[in-house]
Amino acid sequence: MNLTNHFLVAMPSMKDPYFKRSVIYICEHNQDGAMGLMINAPIDITVGGMLKQVDIEPAYPQSHQENLKKPVFNGGPVSEDRGFILHRPRDHYESSMKMTDDIAVTTSKDILTVLGTEAEPEGYIVALGYSGWSAGQLEVELTENSWLTIEADPELIFNTPVHEKWQKAIQKLGISPAQLSSDAGHA
């Protein structure tokens, strides 16, 4: 099972308050573990505020300043000082990994210089930190009924209001959160 380019959607019964009602985009999943970014956990800083904190000046005139008011997200509890930009592919940046035709992840600072300008990606979220699992850890959590998995949808990442992402992700399975039980079935 490879969950790269899938969402992990926290079950309503998620016991860990850090991940309660979270939606995580899985960037990498292999025999060594998994790495993903929470896409619905905004923190109390805007993209523009973050750019000021790290002394990033825009490479072009800021024609899209409204986007600088977007929140930065908590990507997860690991390396919270590291930034990740989940975006629609546009240009090639120094350190980008194209996940699909519609989703890429960039960790280099060069993408930050185009945020708020006409050269910015069509859709993006900025996350600090990531969610990580050691080898076999995610698989155990799945058998414990902690997560639902669904194929990633760029519309949910980039165009769905933050407060609706968890419910919309569950609805993609054709169910509502109220229909979910925390009890795993055994045959």
UniProtKB/Swiss-Prot annotation:
NCBIfam families from the UniProt entry: PRK00228.1-1
Organism: Vibrio cholerae serotype O1 (strain ATCC 39315 / El Tor Inaba N16961)
PANTHER family: UNCHARACTERIZED PROTEIN YQGE, UPF0301 PROTEIN YQGE
Family: Belongs to the UPF0301 (AlgH) family.
InterPro entries tied to this protein: AlgH-like (IPR003774)
Name listed for the protein in its UniProt record: UPF0301 protein VC_0467
Pfam families per UniProt: DUF179 (PF02622)
Gene Ontology annotations for the cellular component aspect, listed alphabetically: cytosol
